[in-house]
């Protein structure tokens, strides 16, 4: 019998000037980037959170805190590799990942 576990991950970072935009480990050519302690890759962060949750291993902030010098500007693919290693210590492996990215830029107008 298969032991299937499902996790749900969610992450949000603000778009700002002066940062690179990383999504799913790919650098996108865009004038804004996501603000964060690491590279702020929201897709990878949400995936890490989902994997950790499915394994009942808390969340990404617990394992990779934004107060750690080790995670400052880190490539989120490294966090994903470490997360996969963490869940492997509990006997779990990734069978499938399904992710949806919701993104928008809010524009405001002086007209009311």
Model-flagged regions — what are they?
Residues 28-38, 66-71, 106:
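A short glycine/serine-rich beta->alpha loop
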Residues 107-112:
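Conserved small/polar residues in nucleotide/adenosyl-binding loops
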Residues 24-31, 60-67, 97-99:
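A short small-residue
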Residues 4-11:
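Short amphipathic
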Residues 93-105:
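Short glycine-rich, basic-tinged beta-strand/loop micro-motifs
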Residues 52-92:
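Glycine- and Gly-Pro-enriched alpha-helical subdomains that act as flexible
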Residues 13-27:
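Acidic-glycine-rich active-site phosphate/pyrophosphate-binding loop
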Residues 43, 47, 51:
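Active-site His/Glu-centered metal-binding helix of metallohydrolases
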